Amino acid sequence: MLTLKIFVYTVVTFFVCLFIFGFLSNDPARNPGKNLD
């Protein structure tokens, strides 16, 4: 059960990091290169 819990926490943390990274990369304030044109 401990291994399953660690696996679940790892997957959840991974998806949360993906969501945060995607949100920041799509934010114009965080990516000034999209505002050049």
Curated annotation (Swiss-Prot):
Q: Where are the transmembrane segments?
A: 4-24
Q: What is its main location?
A: plastid
Q: Name one GO biological process term.
A: photosynthesis
Compartment(s): Plastid, Chloroplast thylakoid membrane
**Which domain of life does the protein's organism represent?**
Eukaryota
Question: What is reported when this gene is inactivated?
Answer: Able to grow photoautotrophically only in dim light, oxygen evolution is 10-20% of wild-type, reduced accumulation of protein D1 (PsbA).
Tell me which InterPro entries the record gives: PSII_PsbI (IPR003686), PSII_PsbI_sf (IPR037271)
Per its UniProt record, what Pfam families does this chain match?
PsbI
Q: Which GO terms describe its cellular component?
A: chloroplast thylakoid membrane; photosystem II reaction center
What topology does it adopt in the membrane? Single-pass membrane protein
Q: Which UniProt keywords apply?
A: Chloroplast, Membrane, Photosynthesis, Photosystem II, Plastid, Reaction center, Thylakoid, Transmembrane, Transmembrane helix
Q: How does it assemble?
A: PSII is composed of 1 copy each of membrane proteins PsbA, PsbB, PsbC, PsbD, PsbE, PsbF, PsbH, PsbI, PsbJ, PsbK, PsbL, PsbM, PsbT, PsbX, PsbY, PsbZ, Psb30/Ycf12, at least 3 peripheral proteins of the oxygen-evolving complex and a large number of cofactors. It forms dimeric complexes.
Q: What is the stated purpose of this protein?
A: One of the components of the core complex of photosystem II (PSII), required for its stability and/or assembly. PSII is a light-driven water:plastoquinone oxidoreductase that uses light energy to abstract electrons from H(2)O, generating O(2) and a proton gradient subsequently used for ATP formation. It consists of a core antenna complex that captures photons, and an electron transfer chain that converts photonic excitation into a charge separation.
Q: Which NCBIfam families match?
A: PRK02655.1
Q: Which protein family is it in?
A: Belongs to the PsbI family.
Q: What is this protein called?
A: Photosystem II reaction center protein I
This protein's species is Chlamydomonas reinhardtii (Chlamydomonas smithii)
Q: What is the lineage of its organism?
A: Eukaryota, Viridiplantae, Chlorophyta, core chlorophytes, Chlorophyceae
Q: Which gene encodes it?
A: psbI
